Amino acid sequence: MLSFTPSRKLETELRVLQGIVVEIYKNIEQLSPEEAKYLHNFAFVSNIGASTRIENAVLTDQEVDWVDTILQKDGKTTAFEENKKFILDKLEKDRERSVEEVVGCRQMLSTVYLQAKELFPLTEVIIRGLHHDLLRYYPEAANFAGGYKKTPNRVIFINHETGEQRVVLEPSPPGIITSTAMADLVNWYNSNIRENPWPLLVATEFVFRFLAVHPFQDGNGRLGRAHFILTLLQSDDKY
């Protein structure tokens, strides 16, 4: 069950939101295959762009769309490695980290969108696999991609104008506490996502608890946002 009981006001707002979503879903069903494909690609690219820019990547949605188009033409798992020089030459070398983040996020979200149902029940192996996909093109992450953190991490707010720093979140320490917390989280999720009448609330609590653990050395924010989508796709609510 959820760690909280939804208020009547919240349940009313959820019903209103669900009604809006149902109407949107009905409209989407009327689209032609070409229009539906365009809309899906637009949402996919926007998701990648927004999620990586939060982490200070600098590629615009237009540039993300261009990279996605280049990689779609190839379609192989080695597409980025084979096209990396061409992509960086077009987007300037100083954007290399941003490109690597975008391509990794694209890989992870592709898995989420295309295999959501097959990824249920959720396991720690699946979560670590998505993390590996996210960071697979970032060479500096080679030693920790797909593995839980081995050193403490924290979320810090930095005011770049004043230099002031403030700790926003003190996550679980590495080791047995993190691994136990992740095992508990996965078990809780699998027991609730298809039983609770409000999948949106389960998705929200899952991501909150995931970020409270902050199980990986890097990429927790992007992975958490991907998990939000995954949980909704894995629910029994077709809308």
What are these regions (language model features)?
Residues M1-Y239:
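FIC/Doc superfamily catalytic core
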